[in-house]
From Swiss-Prot:
CC annotations in GO: cytosol; riboflavin synthase complex
Protein name in the entry: 6,7-dimethyl-8-ribityllumazine synthase
GO MF: 6,7-dimethyl-8-ribityllumazine synthase activity
Pfam families linked to this entry: DMRL_synthase
Family indicated by similarity: Belongs to the DMRL synthase family.
PANTHER family registered for this protein in UniProt: 6,7-DIMETHYL-8-RIBITYLLUMAZINE SYNTHASE, 6,7-DIMETHYL-8-RIBITYLLUMAZINE SYNTHASE DMRL SYNTHASE LUMAZINE SYNTHASE
Keyword presence, Membrane: no
Gene this chain is encoded by: ribH
Functional note: Catalyzes the formation of 6,7-dimethyl-8-ribityllumazine by condensation of 5-amino-6-(D-ribitylamino)uracil with 3,4-dihydroxy-2-butanone 4-phosphate. This is the penultimate step in the biosynthesis of riboflavin.
EC numbers: 2.5.1.78
Oligomeric form and interacting partners: Forms an icosahedral capsid composed of 60 subunits, arranged as a dodecamer of pentamers.
Gene3D superfamilies, per the entry: Lumazine/riboflavin synthase
Organism this protein belongs to: Bacillus cereus (strain B4264)
Active site: H87 (proton donor)
Length: 153
């Protein structure tokens, strides 16, 4: 038997957690995610967005959303750009571990849509220019995974 997720979002309720730090990028990721959800049939009234200060704060609110029982999937969006210190490494590692841990603990998909880039240019490319919009891609993944995970509910 082959299991596949559908790309029709009708009837799904989705939570989105967005880091405000680097908002000029994260707002584009959010725009892409909202576009992806709506294009695939998720009603605007079925999408809740929570803004948090930065990427490091994403896992806590994602956990609260995922454990609320209100959502079929949670999308996490943020942007961490390497600077001159090791802060980048700590933030990237902890956010990735936090979201990955939630994906395994919760009964719903928690999608990792946090950009971890070396440069501002790379972040811009992934927020809607050369490399597509990772927010949009995260939305499509959330829809597919929500349907796929329900096959074992």
């Amino acid at each position: 038997m082959v299991f596949e997720g559908h790309l029709v979002g009708t009837g799904l309720k989705v939570g989105v957690v967005v880091g405000r730090f680097n908002e000029f990028i994260t707002s584009k990721l959010l725009g892409g995610a909202l576009d992806g959800l709506k294009r695939h049939g998720v009603e605007e009234s079925d999408i809740d967005v929570a803004w948090v200060p930065g990427a490091f704060e994403i896992p806590l609110i994602a956990k609260k959303m995922a454990s609320s029982g209100k959502y079929d999937a949670v999308i996490t969006l943020g942007t961490v750009i390497r600077g001159a210190t090791t802060h980048y490494d700590y933030v990237c590692n902890e956010v990735a571990k936090g979201v990955a841990s939630l994906s395994l603990q919760m009964d719903i998909p928690v999608i990792f849509g946090v950009l971890t880039t070396e440069t501002i240019e790379q972040a811009i490319e992934r927020a809607g220019t050369k490399a597509g919009n990772k927010g949009y891609e995260s939305a499509v993944a959330a829809i597919e995974m929500a349907h796929l995970s329900k096959q074992w509910a």
